[in-house]
Amino acid sequence: LQPKSTMVSFFHTTRDLDTVKALKEQSVTGFSMHLIPRTTLAQKMDALSSQANIAGYKAVLMAASRIGIYMPLLMTAAGTIRPAKVLVIGAGVAGLQAIATAKRLGSQVEAFDVRPVVKEQVESLGAKFIEVESSDEEGVGEGGYAKETSDDYKKRQQELIHDHISKSDVVITTAL
């Protein structure tokens, strides 16, 4: 690298100390992509968010090519074919993209997330938000990310999801 240039990569600054030292000696400015914050402002440069977006989109396309029914509602001379029912578990970046893509293909979409705050985002995409009845913000952790839930919540969650999976043609899991 030329002195005073800029390097953008995935090197780990805390483990690749020799690389950091070599960059410093050449007055090279280094940006490690894994350290970019997961904020709205930095989302275009956030490698995890960009890959999650692609994963959500591709998951729906792969499902559409593999199920034995059509994604949209079809009305033909022979009758009406109901739309595919898609359940998306997890409404983060990948989940929201999966919801949007499935809706654009004409599917009937439901989504689940432990964070009740994403209900508005899910519904704004035209999907039905399914949730475990809870008196508090049980699944919401620091920074709005999901956190560990109680055993009682998990039991109710399993029952709810089991009921919806049994009625779905496609299930896409995006929750980490």
For the regions a language model picked out, list residue spans one by one.
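An anion/phosphate-binding loop that grips the pyrophosphate of nucleotide cofactors and donors
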Residues: 168
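Glycine/serine-rich phosphate-binding loop and adjoining beta1-alpha1 elements at the start
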Residues: 1-85
